Structure formats: C-alpha cells, structure tokens
C-alpha cells in the first residue's frame, strides 16, 4: 500500500530499529520525486524525454511549450503535464495547444494534491507513439543486477493492463542499452531493494 512508498514511515522504522523491507528513505525520496529522478538520469548520461528537471510553475510550463513550438516547427506540439509525486496514471494531462495549458495545469495540480498531498508539477514533450519497457533491478546497497525486461505497452488511462516478459519486440542492442541504463542508475543511487526502471521507446525514432 501507500506505506511502502512513504518516506516518513521508512525513516521511523529505521529510527526505531525496525527493518523496513524496501528502499532506504533516501532512495524513496529520490525516486518519489520525478524531477530528482530525471536529474539522476541526466547525471548518469541516460537519455530522457525533453522536459523540465524541477518543480515547474505555470509560466515555466508555458515557456517550455513555446520552446517545443520552436524546436518542432509546429504551432501545436504535444506536451505532458505530470505530477512530481505519486504514480498509477494519476496527475497527468496532455495538452496540444498553448491556450489549453493554464486550465490543464490547474486541474493537474488539484488532482496531484488530492491524490498525493503534493501539487508540484513538471512538464515534458509527449511521445505519442511509444512502447513502455520496464527493467527489473535488484541491489544490496553495493552490488546490482537485473531480472530482465518486460513490455507494458497495453494500457488504459496510463495504467498497465498486460505485461509481457521478456518484451517480444526489443532488438538485442536496445535491450542491452536499456538494461545498462537501469543498472547505472541503480548503482549511482546505492539501490538496496528490488525496483523497476521504466523507459519509453519512441516508435518513430527507436
């Protein structure tokens, strides 16, 4: 449940000599904040979807959308507004025009606050045709290894319906690249748990 991702609960366990079966409080804090997780990927030289790497104001979201207009030579590029906290497909809004951003930003912030107790948002370019690939990784705080990949592209409302392991569509070279990226981030964070790193593979430019 939600306690498995609660930083304060993990800290209390640690302070009271109770073994918390899960990530350390530091790792929960790092990966529970998508902006800091994005920054870890950047620092690990793992490619990320173009976006903001910190809590993003409405004005910053508008500026980023304008930069997408310039970089794509399109008046109506696609952008995703996402909650910094949480998951499960909640706190996400697609926008396809500059005029829609203010209203969708407000809705997304409200949903994020209601679901996760944190209204912070960030934005990124929307990859409209993508495969969702996950790499399972396990670490003991020093050493890390992987348990291969699975494809989770069959979704409804950003929530997985079907998982196929291993992915039947990944080329060997790309599979190795994704596994290496997951292991690099796990190693840099001192992973002491079993966790999943999620990747998007752009079908238009895999």
Question: Over which residues does each language-model region extend?
Answer:
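N-terminal beta-alpha lobe that positions the nucleotide/phosphoryl donor
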Residues: 1-206
